[in-house]
Amino acid sequence: MTIFSTISSMSNVSSSSKSKISLMANSNGGQSLNNISCGGCGGSSSGGIVYTGPSGRSYTLPELIAVGVAHTKAFLMGASGSGNCSC
């Protein structure tokens, strides 16, 4: 199972083949706080969005994928509102 199919299986997450993953969240200046592409001002490859984990450590999407699909799924399920745009 790929990370995209795992994420797509969650009811509040949508994904595309370009790794643009959006969690439902309030927007800030037109940029979704939990959109990996950060409103087009960045991208997963450039760290356009950062998620803060339960331990306080910050993760980019590639880092979340690197730590494993199971951990990523559990993390994303509880990550609503924790992303921050850094453009």
UniProtKB/Swiss-Prot annotation:
One matching Pfam family: Coiled
> Can you supply a Gene Ontology BP term from the record?
sorocarp development
Q: Which PANTHER family has this protein been placed in? A: HSSA/B-LIKE PROTEIN 1-RELATED-RELATED, HSSA_B-LIKE PROTEIN 1-RELATED
Instruction: State the family named in the UniProt similarity comment for this chain.
Output: Belongs to the hssA/B family.
Q: What is this protein called?
A: HssA/B-like protein 31
Q: Which organism is it from?
A: Dictyostelium discoideum (Social amoeba)
Gene from which the chain derives: hssl31
